From Swiss-Prot:
Transmembrane domains' residue ranges: 15-32
InterPro entries registered for this protein in UniProt: CEBPZOS (IPR037764)
Keywords from the UniProt entry: Membrane, Mitochondrion, Transmembrane, Transmembrane helix
UniProt organism field: Homo sapiens
GO cellular component: mitochondrial membrane; mitochondrion
Key word Membrane present: yes
Coiled coil: none
Keyword set includes Membrane: yes
Record's bilayer topology term: Single-pass membrane protein
Name the record gives this protein: Protein CEBPZOS
Cellular localization per UniProt: Mitochondrion membrane
Length: 80
């Protein structure tokens, strides 16, 4: 019985591993895009504000302050 489950277990493991890698690379791409583009952050603030909040908190925890304030100032000035 254990022998027949081995190939299934390997397939499941590979599937989980691929899903993890896709998630890590997706998160890196999203962070990179938000970190380099204020316009993208503005789009994220309208569509997915909770994701932008995670970005702001993670950058503040890493010691990079002022991004949130700069964004808010720029967006407020662009409305006027």
């Amino acid at each position: 019985m254990a022998r027949t489950l081995e190939p299934l277990a390997k397939k499941i493991f590979k599937g989980v591993l691929v899903a993890e890698l896709v998630g890590v690379f997706g998160a890196y791409f999203l962070f990179s895009k938000m970190h380099t583009s204020q316009d993208f952050r503005q789009t994220m603030s309208k569509k997915y504000p909770f994701i932008l909040e995670v970005y702001y908190k993670s950058t503040e925890k890493s010691g990079m302050y002022g991004i949130r304030e700069l964004d808010q100032k720029t967006w407020l000035n662009s409305k006027n």
